[in-house]
Amino acid sequence: MLDNRPFKRLLLGTALALGLIGSAAAADLQPLRVANQKSTIKALLEASGETRNVPYTIQWSEFPSASPLGEALNAGAVDIGALGDAPYVFALGAGASLKVVSIIHSEGRTTTALVVPKDSPIKTVADLKGKKIVTGRGSIGHYLAIKALATAGLTTQDVQFIFLLPSESRLVLDNGTADAWATWDPYTTVVTSQSQARVLISGNQLLSNHLYLAATSQAIADKRPQLDDFVARVDRAYAWANTHPNEYAAAQARITGLPLDVHVTVAKDTRLNPVTIDDAVIRGLQATADTYQQEGLLLKHIDVSQGFDKSFNAKRVPFNQASR
């Protein structure tokens, strides 16, 4: 019997894009299983109104950090989720059959930074030799620390890492167990405003500051209409966040429990823009993977080009390509 599922998905996708899909056709669309980290995609879509009138069910799964989210993608327990550069590389390194279908670039403030206590004698990255750095294993903070150390001719062998979640990391920085913390917003804003920590080095010139929406190959094959629609909603939601920082901040604060003014500061000082999936982006992520291999954190070479699907560019909002 002729398999007409690809043709059927094409028709559904076209109807979805044109807003022509009705309740009967919507019933043919399988639920989209979306992995969410606290205060990220779900909060954004809900605050912007993009969870209304969705012609398929979104099934959310919550994860405390990028590492278990990547593991869920690898296991096929979810269809799509958002990861930074480093966690996505680790997911690919674990053999995950994933493709980046959307990229958002964050710019405008210290979105990632290596911070030290306000009275720390550490004045330069070179002073970190022999010191303890707290961050999340395989996180964007971990990668930032590696890149920052390299600027001073140091490697991970010159420091001691303490791997913890952000909620625990601030405590060990404040009590002196760690000498520095490699982290990201809103935590950079929290620790610099509340503990008066100093930014030793910003990640703005060291990292891409990209957020990757990665989908499983199976989901791309079986749920393309839903994915096309979902990435467009995410793009629209981030555009909304750029013009509604107070509302976006309030939505995040309700979830994280962090002070509202912290989220307002971050939201007002950050621009979130779509980035096309192109060769420059792929080269940038390849450099991340190669760095991890050189540090011995990846045991083999990974060709990251396999982890992108450029066909999704056509379904997204017009691009004003951010610097990479």
Segments and roles (model prediction):
Residues A43, E71, A75, V89, ...:
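Solvent-exposed, polar/charged alpha-helical surfaces in well-ordered, non-transmembrane soluble domains
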Residues L2-L12:
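Bacterial N-terminal signal peptides that target proteins for export
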Residues Q293-R324:
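Conserved C-terminal helix/tail region of periplasmic/extracytoplasmic solute-binding proteins
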Residues A86, F161-I162, S167-R254:
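Pocket-lining segment of extracytoplasmic ligand-binding domains
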Residues D222-L299:
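Secondary-structure end/capping motifs
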